[in-house]
């Protein structure tokens, strides 16, 4: 029911079109996922502390991104998934494989936060 993807992006990377990879069609106004009607994206980032990392004290650099394929409409969307290299946590893929549907937001976070993000989304989902 819930799809969590580990994020490993360390910096801004060029977009495919920017480096000459061709795609059919035209981009939306912002060339972003939010150009798709009904899609909503939200995020939260925590940055705390500076200097050398001290275990248990920081500094902290973490966050979570939520993608709601149909916005606040909870109707399922057709879905599938693909594992590029098997690294990271992909919670919820069994349901997608069995049903072919995604019924919850797509959450992107670090591996250590997968459990707490899953729990928070399920609490939110029950309330809506």
Place the predicted regions along the sequence by residue:
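Bacterial Sec-dependent N-terminal signal peptides
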Residues: 1-12
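Alpha/propeptide regions of enzymes that mature by internal proteolysis
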Residues: 11-128
